[in-house]
Amino acid sequence: MAEHYFSSAPAVASDPALVGLHLPGLELSLLADRGVFSSRRVDPGTLALLRESPAPPVAGQLLDLGCGYGPIACALATRSPGATVWAVDVNSRALELAASNAERLGLHNVRVALPDEVPETTRFDGLWSNPPVRVGKEALHDLLATWLPRLTDASSAWMVANKHLGGDSLAAWLTGQGWAVRRAASKSGYRVFQVAR
């Protein structure tokens, strides 16, 4: 079976490269590597998510679920220096890169963690994710069913999914689970959703 970016320990040879994250009012240079999601450029879905979601809360606990090398976490931490940003992934190489990028950028408010390293009592004032749709529907649904209930009552999740990789069916599934889902934007085949209680 081919190795994927959601493998816990990528075996593919390392070949790090710098990629640029270009957003209105924010330019970040991030180190990426083979064996992690979108290792040669910031994924267009991630860009759509960051461009179309509102500014994050200025304080509280924020979650980047499936953080990869950290473009979402680093953007959130830069925009909300008073918040704690949890960068969570199962991929060890991704976590090393996310930690390195946060440190290099002086973002001391980023906490890089495996899923089981996040205290169970932690509740989130916002969740952002370009979720790993290629992991399969069942695993994706389990992932979201685990983390979405950890949102505080007044907070939202912001997610992006490619229309051609099940973005609309993901929104329908979330609605069927009792979540209020609003399509905030549709850009170049990517759906940006707000998910709330």
PLM regions: where:
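Conserved SAM/SAH cofactor-binding pocket of Class I
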Residues: 45-129
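N-terminal auxiliary segments of SAM/dcSAM-dependent transferases
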Residues: 1-24, 34-35, 39
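Short "lid" loop at the C-terminus of a central beta-strand within the Rossmann-like core
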Residues: 133-135, 162-167
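Conserved SAM-binding loop and adjacent beta-strand
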Residues: 32-51
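Conserved beta-strand signature within the Rossmann-like core of class I S-adenosyl-L-methionine
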Residues: 154-161
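Class I S-adenosyl-L-methionine
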Residues: 3-15, 167-197
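Glycine-rich phosphate-binding "P-loop"
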Residues: 126-138
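A short glycine-rich, Lys/Arg-flanked "PGG" loop and its adjoining helix->strand segment in the class I
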Residues: 141-153
